[in-house]
Protein backbone atom coordinates (compact mmCIF):
# COMPACT_ATOMS: atom_id res chain seq x y z
CA UNK A 1 0.00 0.00 0.00
CA UNK A 2 1.49 3.31 -1.09
CA UNK A 3 -0.85 5.63 0.72
CA UNK A 4 -1.22 5.64 4.49
CA UNK A 5 -2.54 8.62 6.42
CA UNK A 6 -5.42 9.51 8.70
CA UNK A 7 -8.22 9.52 6.12
CA UNK A 8 -10.84 7.01 7.23
CA UNK A 9 -13.53 8.27 4.87
CA UNK A 10 -11.66 10.02 2.08
CA UNK A 11 -12.33 7.24 -0.40
CA UNK A 12 -16.04 8.14 -0.21
CA UNK A 13 -17.56 10.88 -2.31
CA UNK A 14 -18.12 13.84 -0.01
CA UNK A 15 -19.64 17.25 -0.79
CA UNK A 16 -16.77 18.88 1.09
CA UNK A 17 -14.47 17.91 -1.79
CA UNK A 18 -16.34 20.23 -4.13
CA UNK A 19 -15.54 23.23 -1.92
CA UNK A 20 -11.80 22.47 -1.74
CA UNK A 21 -11.39 21.07 -5.27
CA UNK A 22 -8.83 23.68 -6.33
CA UNK A 23 -6.61 22.88 -3.35
CA UNK A 24 -6.69 19.06 -3.28
CA UNK A 25 -3.26 17.41 -3.26
CA UNK A 26 -2.65 15.20 -6.32
CA UNK A 27 -1.35 11.91 -4.92
CA UNK A 28 -0.98 10.16 -8.27
CA UNK A 29 1.05 12.97 -9.81
CA UNK A 30 3.36 12.97 -6.79
CA UNK A 31 3.87 9.19 -6.93
CA UNK A 32 4.62 9.06 -10.65
CA UNK A 33 7.17 11.86 -10.35
CA UNK A 34 8.91 10.58 -7.23
CA UNK A 35 9.01 6.87 -8.04
CA UNK A 36 10.59 7.83 -11.38
CA UNK A 37 13.12 10.05 -9.57
CA UNK A 38 13.80 7.28 -7.05
CA UNK A 39 14.65 4.78 -9.79
CA UNK A 40 16.93 7.29 -11.56
CA UNK A 41 18.70 8.19 -8.31
CA UNK A 42 19.24 4.53 -7.41
CA UNK A 43 20.84 3.90 -10.81
CA UNK A 44 23.04 7.00 -10.53
CA UNK A 45 24.21 6.08 -7.03
CA UNK A 46 25.06 2.57 -8.14
CA UNK A 47 27.32 4.12 -10.77
CA UNK A 48 28.91 6.78 -8.56
CA UNK A 49 29.16 4.72 -5.33
CA UNK A 50 28.77 7.99 -3.40
CA UNK A 51 25.81 7.72 -1.01
CA UNK A 52 24.14 10.95 0.08
CA UNK A 53 22.93 11.85 3.58
CA UNK A 54 19.50 10.27 3.01
CA UNK A 55 21.16 6.98 2.07
CA UNK A 56 23.15 7.03 5.29
CA UNK A 57 20.00 7.60 7.37
CA UNK A 58 18.21 4.83 5.47
CA UNK A 59 21.06 2.40 6.18
CA UNK A 60 21.09 3.26 9.89
CA UNK A 61 17.33 2.72 10.18
CA UNK A 62 17.38 -0.46 8.10
CA UNK A 63 20.11 -1.90 10.34
CA UNK A 64 17.98 -1.19 13.42
CA UNK A 65 14.94 -2.81 11.82
CA UNK A 66 16.99 -5.90 10.89
CA UNK A 67 18.49 -6.03 14.37
CA UNK A 68 14.95 -6.26 15.78
CA UNK A 69 13.96 -8.85 13.16
CA UNK A 70 10.98 -6.88 11.80
CA UNK A 71 11.15 -8.80 8.56
CA UNK A 72 8.93 -10.59 6.07
CA UNK A 73 9.17 -14.38 6.64
CA UNK A 74 11.87 -13.51 9.21
CA UNK A 75 14.25 -12.95 6.28
CA UNK A 76 13.45 -9.95 4.12
CA UNK A 77 13.20 -6.24 4.86
CA UNK A 78 10.24 -5.10 2.81
CA UNK A 79 9.44 -2.59 1.57
CA UNK A 80 12.92 -1.19 1.10
CA UNK A 81 13.21 1.88 3.31
CA UNK A 82 13.21 4.99 1.17
CA UNK A 83 12.18 8.54 2.04
CA UNK A 84 12.15 12.01 0.52
CA UNK A 85 12.63 15.29 2.37
CA UNK A 86 10.25 17.87 0.94
CA UNK A 87 7.25 20.06 1.73
CA UNK A 88 4.47 17.82 3.02
CA UNK A 89 0.78 18.26 2.17
CA UNK A 90 -1.71 19.93 4.44
CA UNK A 91 -4.70 17.98 5.68
CA UNK A 92 -8.25 19.22 6.22
CA UNK A 93 -9.79 17.64 9.32
CA UNK A 94 -13.53 17.64 10.03
CA UNK A 95 -15.27 17.00 13.36
CA UNK A 96 -18.80 17.64 14.63
CA UNK A 97 -19.08 20.70 16.85
CA UNK A 98 -20.87 18.88 19.69
CA UNK A 99 -18.19 16.20 20.16
CA UNK A 100 -14.59 15.46 19.32
CA UNK A 101 -14.68 12.88 16.54
CA UNK A 102 -12.79 12.53 13.27
CA UNK A 103 -15.46 12.22 10.58
CA UNK A 104 -13.63 13.23 7.42
CA UNK A 105 -10.22 14.28 6.15
CA UNK A 106 -8.59 15.07 2.84
CA UNK A 107 -5.10 16.06 1.74
CA UNK A 108 -4.58 19.59 0.46
CA UNK A 109 -1.72 21.25 -1.43
CA UNK A 110 1.56 21.93 0.36
CA UNK A 111 2.03 25.68 0.11
CA UNK A 112 -1.19 27.08 1.53
CA UNK A 113 -0.81 30.40 3.33
CA UNK A 114 -2.37 30.99 6.74
CA UNK A 115 -4.98 33.21 5.10
CA UNK A 116 -5.85 30.48 2.58
CA UNK A 117 -6.18 27.92 5.38
CA UNK A 118 -8.51 30.22 7.30
CA UNK A 119 -10.65 30.87 4.21
CA UNK A 120 -11.06 27.10 3.69
CA UNK A 121 -11.87 26.49 7.36
CA UNK A 122 -14.40 29.31 7.61
CA UNK A 123 -16.07 28.28 4.36
CA UNK A 124 -16.46 24.63 5.41
CA UNK A 125 -17.60 25.48 8.94
CA UNK A 126 -20.31 27.86 7.75
CA UNK A 127 -21.50 25.62 4.93
CA UNK A 128 -21.65 22.34 6.85
CA UNK A 129 -21.93 23.45 10.51
CA UNK A 130 -18.85 21.49 11.52
CA UNK A 131 -15.49 22.12 13.13
CA UNK A 132 -12.66 22.30 10.58
CA UNK A 133 -8.93 22.78 10.70
CA UNK A 134 -6.11 22.64 8.15
CA UNK A 135 -2.92 21.15 9.59
CA UNK A 136 0.52 20.36 8.22
CA UNK A 137 1.30 16.64 7.90
CA UNK A 138 4.35 15.44 9.85
CA UNK A 139 5.01 12.61 7.41
CA UNK A 140 3.11 10.37 5.05
CA UNK A 141 3.62 6.79 3.89
CA UNK A 142 3.71 7.34 0.17
CA UNK A 143 6.54 5.49 -1.53
CA UNK A 144 9.07 6.84 -0.96
CA UNK A 145 7.84 8.15 2.39
CA UNK A 146 7.45 11.93 2.44
CA UNK A 147 9.05 13.67 5.44
CA UNK A 148 9.12 17.45 6.12
CA UNK A 149 12.41 18.91 4.94
CA UNK A 150 12.68 21.40 7.80
CA UNK A 151 12.67 18.77 10.58
CA UNK A 152 15.56 18.26 12.97
CA UNK A 153 17.64 15.10 12.56
CA UNK A 154 16.08 13.09 15.41
CA UNK A 155 12.55 13.76 14.17
CA UNK A 156 13.51 12.79 10.62
CA UNK A 157 14.63 9.41 11.94
CA UNK A 158 11.53 8.93 14.09
CA UNK A 159 9.07 9.99 11.39
CA UNK A 160 10.79 7.95 8.69
CA UNK A 161 10.50 4.83 10.86
CA UNK A 162 6.87 5.72 11.61
CA UNK A 163 5.93 5.89 7.93
CA UNK A 164 7.87 2.74 7.04
CA UNK A 165 5.98 0.85 9.76
CA UNK A 166 2.70 1.91 8.13
CA UNK A 167 3.99 0.45 4.86
CA UNK A 168 5.06 -2.74 6.66
CA UNK A 169 1.73 -3.19 8.49
CA UNK A 170 -0.17 -2.60 5.25
CA UNK A 171 1.00 -6.08 4.24
CA UNK A 172 -0.99 -7.52 7.16
CA UNK A 173 -4.56 -7.35 8.49
CA UNK A 174 -3.75 -4.57 10.95
CA UNK A 175 -2.70 -2.03 8.33
CA UNK A 176 -5.23 -3.19 5.77
CA UNK A 177 -8.04 -2.39 8.23
CA UNK A 178 -6.72 0.98 9.41
CA UNK A 179 -9.76 2.80 8.00
CA UNK A 180 -12.39 0.34 9.20
CA UNK A 181 -13.29 2.72 12.02
CA UNK A 182 -11.71 5.32 14.30
CA UNK A 183 -10.71 2.66 16.84
CA UNK A 184 -8.66 0.77 14.27
CA UNK A 185 -7.16 4.04 13.07
CA UNK A 186 -6.15 4.90 16.64
CA UNK A 187 -4.73 1.41 17.23
CA UNK A 188 -2.61 1.61 14.08
CA UNK A 189 -1.34 5.13 14.75
CA UNK A 190 -0.65 4.56 18.44
CA UNK A 191 1.15 1.26 17.83
CA UNK A 192 3.27 2.71 15.03
CA UNK A 193 4.14 5.75 17.16
CA UNK A 194 5.09 3.52 20.11
CA UNK A 195 7.37 1.28 18.02
CA UNK A 196 8.95 4.12 16.03
CA UNK A 197 9.85 5.97 19.23
CA UNK A 198 11.56 2.86 20.60
CA UNK A 199 13.55 2.23 17.43
CA UNK A 200 14.48 5.91 17.08
CA UNK A 201 15.62 6.02 20.71
CA UNK A 202 17.81 2.98 20.07
CA UNK A 203 19.47 4.89 17.24
CA UNK A 204 19.72 8.23 19.05
CA UNK A 205 21.24 6.99 22.30
CA UNK A 206 23.12 10.10 23.42
CA UNK A 207 20.85 12.76 24.88
CA UNK A 208 22.23 16.27 25.29
CA UNK A 209 21.54 18.71 28.07
CA UNK A 210 19.52 20.85 25.63
CA UNK A 211 17.23 17.88 25.07
CA UNK A 212 16.57 17.73 28.81
CA UNK A 213 15.67 21.41 28.90
CA UNK A 214 13.40 20.94 25.93
CA UNK A 215 11.72 18.04 27.72
CA UNK A 216 10.73 20.35 30.60
CA UNK A 217 9.17 22.76 28.11
CA UNK A 218 7.31 19.91 26.43
CA UNK A 219 5.96 18.70 29.78
CA UNK A 220 4.59 22.18 30.47
CA UNK A 221 2.81 22.20 27.11
CA UNK A 222 1.52 18.66 27.62
CA UNK A 223 0.00 19.55 30.97
CA UNK A 224 -1.76 22.63 29.57
CA UNK A 225 -3.13 20.88 26.49
CA UNK A 226 -4.40 17.89 28.52
CA UNK A 227 -6.21 20.33 30.79
CA UNK A 228 -7.70 22.05 27.73
CA UNK A 229 -8.90 18.73 26.30
CA UNK A 230 -10.42 17.63 29.61
CA UNK A 231 -12.42 20.84 30.13
CA UNK A 232 -13.50 20.90 26.48
CA UNK A 233 -14.80 17.32 26.65
CA UNK A 234 -16.72 18.15 29.79
CA UNK A 235 -18.35 21.25 28.27
CA UNK A 236 -19.26 19.46 25.04
CA UNK A 237 -20.82 16.58 26.98
CA UNK A 238 -23.19 19.19 28.45
CA UNK A 239 -23.82 20.63 24.96
CA UNK A 240 -22.15 23.91 25.94
CA UNK A 241 -20.59 24.31 22.51
CA UNK A 242 -20.18 28.11 22.52
CA UNK A 243 -18.52 28.08 25.93
CA UNK A 244 -16.21 25.23 24.88
CA UNK A 245 -15.14 27.10 21.75
CA UNK A 246 -14.48 30.31 23.67
CA UNK A 247 -12.46 28.31 26.21
CA UNK A 248 -10.35 26.67 23.47
CA UNK A 249 -9.69 30.10 21.95
CA UNK A 250 -8.59 31.52 25.31
CA UNK A 251 -6.31 28.52 25.89
CA UNK A 252 -4.81 28.92 22.42
CA UNK A 253 -4.06 32.57 23.19
CA UNK A 254 -2.58 31.60 26.56
CA UNK A 255 -0.26 29.04 24.95
CA UNK A 256 0.72 31.59 22.29
CA UNK A 257 1.64 34.04 25.07
CA UNK A 258 3.83 31.33 26.59
CA UNK A 259 5.72 30.96 23.31
CA UNK A 260 3.96 27.92 21.83
CA UNK A 261 3.02 28.46 18.20
CA UNK A 262 -0.49 27.07 17.77
CA UNK A 263 -2.65 28.70 15.14
CA UNK A 264 -5.96 27.18 16.19
CA UNK A 265 -7.46 24.83 18.79
CA UNK A 266 -10.92 23.47 18.10
CA UNK A 267 -12.83 20.18 18.01
CA UNK A 268 -11.19 19.18 14.73
CA UNK A 269 -7.73 19.86 16.17
CA UNK A 270 -8.33 17.41 19.00
CA UNK A 271 -10.06 14.94 16.67
CA UNK A 272 -6.92 14.71 14.53
CA UNK A 273 -4.55 14.09 17.42
CA UNK A 274 -6.90 11.70 19.20
CA UNK A 275 -5.74 8.95 16.82
CA UNK A 276 -2.25 9.21 18.33
CA UNK A 277 -2.38 7.76 21.83
CA UNK A 278 1.10 9.05 22.65
CA UNK A 279 0.07 12.72 22.32
CA UNK A 280 -1.28 14.95 25.11
CA UNK A 281 -4.21 15.95 22.88
CA UNK A 282 -5.48 12.36 22.87
CA UNK A 283 -7.78 10.71 25.40
CA UNK A 284 -7.62 7.18 23.98
CA UNK A 285 -5.98 4.70 26.38
CA UNK A 286 -4.52 2.39 23.76
CA UNK A 287 -0.89 3.22 24.58
CA UNK A 288 -1.13 1.97 28.17
CA UNK A 289 -2.77 -1.23 26.90
CA UNK A 290 -0.02 -1.77 24.35
CA UNK A 291 2.56 -1.37 27.09
CA UNK A 292 0.76 -4.06 29.10
CA UNK A 293 0.94 -6.44 26.15
CA UNK A 294 4.62 -5.56 25.70
CA UNK A 295 5.43 -6.66 29.27
CA UNK A 296 4.57 -10.22 28.20
CA UNK A 297 6.39 -9.91 24.87
CA UNK A 298 9.82 -8.48 25.58
CA UNK A 299 11.19 -8.94 22.07
CA UNK A 300 9.87 -6.29 19.72
CA UNK A 301 9.30 -8.66 16.79
CA UNK A 302 7.28 -11.04 19.01
CA UNK A 303 5.19 -8.09 20.19
CA UNK A 304 4.59 -7.01 16.58
CA UNK A 305 3.73 -10.53 15.44
CA UNK A 306 1.10 -10.74 18.16
CA UNK A 307 -0.67 -7.64 16.82
CA UNK A 308 -0.08 -7.47 13.07
CA UNK A 309 -2.97 -9.80 12.13
CA UNK A 310 -5.66 -7.94 14.08
CA UNK A 311 -8.47 -7.02 11.66
CA UNK A 312 -10.93 -5.45 14.11
CA UNK A 313 -10.75 -3.79 17.51
CA UNK A 314 -12.54 -6.63 19.30
CA UNK A 315 -9.58 -8.90 18.47
CA UNK A 316 -7.30 -6.41 20.19
CA UNK A 317 -9.57 -6.53 23.23
CA UNK A 318 -9.48 -10.34 23.13
CA UNK A 319 -5.68 -10.22 23.41
CA UNK A 320 -6.01 -7.96 26.45
CA UNK A 321 -8.45 -10.37 28.11
CA UNK A 322 -6.77 -13.64 27.14
CA UNK A 323 -3.84 -13.34 29.53
CA UNK A 324 -4.37 -12.87 33.27
CA UNK A 325 -1.22 -10.77 33.77
CA UNK A 326 -2.10 -8.46 30.88
CA UNK A 327 -5.66 -8.19 32.17
CA UNK A 328 -4.39 -7.20 35.64
CA UNK A 329 -2.01 -4.67 34.12
CA UNK A 330 -4.80 -3.05 32.09
CA UNK A 331 -7.15 -2.87 35.06
Q: Where would I find each of the regions flagged by the language model?
A:
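Metalloprotease/metallohydrolase-associated module, dominated by Zn2+-dependent proteases
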Residues: 5-15, 186-240
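Generic structural signal for well-ordered, non-membrane alpha-helices
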Residues: 30, 37, 163-169, 226-230, ...
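Acidic/His-rich structured neighborhood in mature extracellular/periplasmic domains
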Residues: 53-212
